[in-house]
Amino acid sequence: MADNLYDSSIIEKQLKEKIENALSIHSYPTAIFFSDKLLNLVTIHSKEYVKILYILCDALYLDRQFQRSSYLIQKYLNAIEEIDKKGEDYQYIDDIHSHHHNQQQNIFYKRIKKEKEDEQYTNTILKLKYLAAKCKIETNEFDQCLQILNKDNDSSENMDDENNNINNNNNKIKKENEINNDNCDDDDDDDDDDDDDDDDEKDSNQLLKFYTNSKSNKSKDISENNSNNENTTKESINKNNTDSSSIDNKNNNKNNNNNNNNNNNNNNNNNNNNNNNNNNNNNNNNNNNNNNFNKETLIIRSSISCLKGKCYESMDNLKKAKFWYIKALLTDYNCFEAFESLTKNHLLTYQEEISLLEKLKFSSDDSWIKEIYSLSLKKYDSPKFTFNYKYLELYDSLNHQNSNNNTFGANNNNNNNNNNNNNNNNNNNNNSNNDISTEDLISVKTLSSSSSSPSKKQENNNLITINEIRKKLIECNDIQTWISEYYFYRHQFQESYSITKRILKQDKYYSNQICLMVNISSMFELQLTNELYFTCHQLVDSFTSSLNNGSHGGSHGGGGGGSHGGSSGNGGAISWYGVACYYHLIQNSDQTQRFFTKSTTLDSRMGASWLGFGHFFASKGEHDQAMAAYRTSSRLLTGCHLPLLCIGMELIRVHNLNLASQYILQAKDICPYDPMIFNELGIIEYKNSQYNEAIKLFETALEICKIKSKASSSSSSSSNYHNLNLSNISFSGVGSSGIGNNNNNNNNRRTTTTTTTTSNNQKKNSSNNKTMIAYLESWEPTIYNLAHCYRKLRKFELALHYYTMSLSLLPNNPSTYSALGFTHHLQGNFDEAIDYYHQSLSIRDDTFTNVLLHKALSLSILQYD
């Protein structure tokens, strides 16, 4: 019997459907099976072959067969390189094509050369390189990953051109003429040469400025090309028109009575114009397709740059990692992975983060993305950058609305809300032109064909305000996490803990590093030992279970398990970091050191663990080990000021004041908005007996605290959040009122309210007062230090005032009672001094206070005698 005949196109179509169905249900072995068969049916080195190869390797990647996936891709890429090298004289070595003739080889090479000129083909090749590099990252082969990515000749040439342009743009400035053309080169020798590492160290603002200029120049070139194309088409149309008019004139000169011929000519001219317009429309469609391919190319190149940054970061080359992350973002600002790596790992300073965000050219429809990006920046209160306050204000207002709903009855709330909504709708209808601008409206409608024009009612339904977008997005876990981080930076630990606790309760497998770290640190600050123990126990269990699953999955597919353990290493590091915090909280030193060591061993690039390790050594008085941990943290967190500040504080403790001031000033350059920096500088001046300078620094720290408190209290005035009248708190010294009086004098801490205030407002005011007072309590040591300075200058009245203020913020502090007694002692008020000494000793026995008490008693007896 004769063999049955099959249609190859039908078989290919059926196989594609089987592959799509298998991928849709995540049956990766099935997809691998059919894509392997389809790959052998398709003509080798064709566009279709490359697409199927990518589908096969992508399925292998998803099935955790990383080595096989990267091997197949590299094998194909090496074959393409051989074709490029040998050209038309290339003789294919493959056994399948060994019988081909030279003429067939030439045809084969020409077809390959033609296909390489296709942009879609080149994009698929880039995607293959990206996938192969991803496989190498999963197997922790970072050098080979860079070798695969650096084979892209276009990118290396672009890097050389960019470096040359950097030097050309900086010829006017002498300091910038020393920049070499080999900055951020992709050669393998760069990792071994210190000179090349020094070449990578340059100002990030200069980098951002260059890339924005280069992108604008490229856009200008594109616009010029488009305008030239339009001009050429217009000229061709005009030429046709002029030619037709000349023909008409000749016909009119020959036969003036032949009007029909003229009409026919005009019709022909109109037809020609219509044909030209159709050609222009086709050209526009082609341009749109090219723009889509250009966007895809930008996305792929941005992902490749981000992958290079991850490789360099894993190799502890943070300078190059920062370079490639920035380049990825400037290529495509939608590459959140690069943005998250820069912000989460503190590779940029706060000023660099702001400048980077301003350089990213967000479209008008993506302005809401810029707000979310700004929320993930460092949580410093810069007076020059308030773009991230929108979500914070909304969160505060929603909290107060929830408190209102919990206080009043549900029926009353529904009626009030309905009335308010009706009133708001009427007001919005009356004042729509004033309240909502065109910039606040974002269209979320999908693109439709030009023939089907939507009605005005549909367009209005598709337009929403930016506030409505915020209200919907504020429930996202990552936005809630960034808000909790903001409260943690402001020492409002209860609020940050409640937010992260709610997130982890709703999504117990939410593995965001920032959320887990804020949750653990908040429990540590609040001294919630039971909650911290339970949370860390859950984290360790989830880490061990994921590690066991990873080792099981690694046996299938060859060498995948080790990479999964590496990815889980970060989660394990956070788990053991939490365990170390728990033992540090219950003062078990041996277990604390053991689990901090375990955390830093699992993830040696986790700067927070090294910072906590340094705090532990500092609390035990082990100066050298604390300094080593702080220096490691400073090397990892290059854009964070806290490690430098901690180094300075540790040097103050060992009385190395000159070196301490240098480190703290470096921290000030990174973050000039942290009051702790000015507090530590004030301590240095105090120890140097420069009391007036110390007073200025302490007052600067307290002024920053007051500005922060005002910013948060006035951030949502509609929700009555500013219940504390912080302007009554005088940090300058003279004529102060408020916290410095008695604990029961709450009137000085609040704004004047009307007599018709409801009980709900009183409860809300008291809760907000507690929040603001809790924030001010964290800066009680600064007020205490300020009182010391005034006592040293023998300004006893001001010293007593600030000691009293310190005592109101932190009651029952024996040191403050002793300081108050000693100040009265110096004034000769021995009876008051004796009372304060007794109050101090009733809380804590202290040798120095006992000595002062005996002296005060003897002096008071002599005074009465």
From Swiss-Prot:
Instruction: Read off the PROSITE patterns from this record.
Output: TPR (PS50005), TPR_REGION (PS50293)
One GO molecular-function annotation for this sequence?
ubiquitin-protein transferase activity
**Listed Acidic residues bias regions:** 183-202
Pathway connected to this protein = Protein modification; protein ubiquitination
**GO-annotated cellular components:** anaphase-promoting complex; cytoplasm
Point to the regions of Low complexity compositional bias: 249-292, 403-434
Q: Where is this region: Disordered?
A: 153-293, 403-436, 738-767
Q: What is its main location?
A: nucleus
Where does this protein reside within or beyond the cell?
Nucleus
Name the UniProt key words of this record, in alphabetical order. Answer: Cell cycle, Cell division, Mitosis, Nucleus, Repeat, TPR repeat, Ubl conjugation pathway
List the Pfam families hit by this protein, alphabetically: TPR_10, TPR_12, TPR_8
- Name the Gene Ontology biological process terms: anaphase-promoting complex-dependent catabolic process; cell division; positive regulation of mitotic metaphase/anaphase transition; protein ubiquitination
| Subunit organization | The APC/C is composed of at least 13 subunits that stay tightly associated throughout the cell cycle: anapc1, anapc2, anapc3, anapc4, anapc5, anapc6, anapc7, anapc8, anapc10, anapc11, cdc20, cdc26 and cdh1.
Q: What's its job?
A: Component of the anaphase promoting complex/cyclosome (APC/C), a cell cycle-regulated E3 ubiquitin-protein ligase complex that controls progression through mitosis and the G1 phase of the cell cycle.
Q: Which family does it belong to?
A: Belongs to the APC6/CDC16 family.
Q: What is this protein called?
A: Anaphase-promoting complex subunit 6
- Source organism per entry reads Dictyostelium discoideum
The gene for this chain is: anapc6
